[in-house]
Amino acid sequence: MAAADLSHGHYLSGDPVCLHEEKTPAGRIVADCLTDCYQDSVTFDDVAVDFTQEEWTLLDSTQRSLYSDVMLENYKNLATVGGQIIKPSLISWLEQEESRTVQGGVLQGWEMRLETQWSILQQDFLRGQTSIGIQLEGKHNGRELCDCEQCGEVFSEHSCLKTHVRTQSTGNTHDCNQYGKDFLTLCEKTSTGEKLSEFNQSEKIFSLTPNIVYQRTSTQEKSFECSHCGKSFINESYLQAHMRTHNGEKLYEWRNYGPGFIDSTSLSVLIETLNAKKPYKCKECGKGYRYPAYLSIHMRTHTGEKPYECKECGKAFNYSNSFQIHGRTHTGEKPYVCKECGKAFTQYSGLSMHVRSHSGDKPYECKECGKSFLTSSRLIQHIRTHTGEKPFVCVECGKAFAVSSNLSGHLRTHTEEKACECKICGKVFGYPSCLNNHMRTHSAQKPYTCKECGKAFNYSTHLKIHMRIHTGEKPYECKQCGKAFSHSSSFQIHERTHTGEKPYECKECGKAFTCSSSFRIHEKTHTEEKPYKCQQCGKAYSHPRSLRRHEQIH
């Protein structure tokens, strides 16, 4: 089901809302949810977390503050990589949280009765959004835009324009009988994306409804100034939050993968609150969903149903968005363009990752060795070098891989097609690039040279590993005994001494080994193969170490 079919819920209302359950809960909250592999045309609605009125009342002030931070960061991510988009009223309202203090005692004893306010915000939000990079000229989602002839402000609703014009001509505001304050209508501000809590000290005019009243401190009272851009804030915590926009620090932890980001506890609490009600359970795996439609989509993972088939190549997909993205491989369409270098991408996730290459932002850090990565998927792959996990197993030969793409390439070696076969040794590869890398082993070409000792290598990765000999770096440490290793393979073999695992078993005699090299040496004892011959006397050995010991005699 396309995301667009599920996007019309209210933030705070009595009506049911849609939370896009086909995505992970954390992905609906953190800004990195924008790289969802099923994402197509991204709007703020796609990355906004929706609440029912009942759910909102369950959140305490800390969780509501966290919600504000999340929504603002999501919007900034969209604005960074997208074209022109009209600022949602929700964002305009939330932005003022950074420069707003609660007027003394006004909120005490008040209930957060926001039905009317949020309903207006949501209506305006639904009308005012277009997809990233698409600005409808003169219209919003098919609706005519209305602009004020006196001041030039633009409105998405004619009724809002009328209210705005009436306020300009009469100066009418809405008076709060309880506190004697004057209020501008919410509509005239929300349609333009203006800040909702702008406060005039002399006239005491607010642009929020009387349900909740905030006073904005004057500029003179903002003593905490940003050294980067000069923006001022009323307290140090607001300044620290703002500084994250400059240094690229991320507020939230992607719970499944665990990079060391702050505020993970608060995020987990919010996630659990969002997932409190999931009555529709999958009988196969027990996973729960809020709505039966989401459960139906999930069931495709068990049934293998792929209802969306490409007419060009016959490839089928579980999800409509995946099908649409695939279609671009045939049309050549690349709608997501980098503003820095002009490089274009078929889907938003590619652009999102590419943008980080310009900023140098690598938010996913390995807790074992400190290495950072652009994406969470790269971090997961890297973590497997520490754990030795290889979850992708070939059903033909049993060979296991840490990365699914490597398994895909390997599977081609079992097919009749041998387009990537080495003509020298007959070895078959899944991809031409793998064959090209392999060919270096037959040639004398070793383009990567160590500046310390002059040793040359076929591959840059081999040079990096070699450099650890000079630097003494040993990033792979055993948690059992504390022993450290410079190579991940050595670390994995060492761990087997603790677990007792011996995966390499001889079919001739049943003897098992912890590493493949020992196994290969042992196999030669059955074949009596002795490929390592002494050039001095002609004596042959099955292993190079035996030959080296023998050569010392000469």
Curated annotation (Swiss-Prot):
Its main location: nucleus. SMART domains: KRAB, ZnF_BED, ZnF_C2H2. Gene3D superfamilies: 6.10.140.140, Classic Zinc Finger (3.30.160.60). GO terms for cellular component: nucleus. Residues 42-112 form the KRAB domain. PANTHER family: ZINC FINGER AND SCAN DOMAIN-CONTAINING (PTHR23226), ZINC FINGER PROTEIN 709-LIKE (PTHR23226:SF430). This is Zinc finger protein 426.
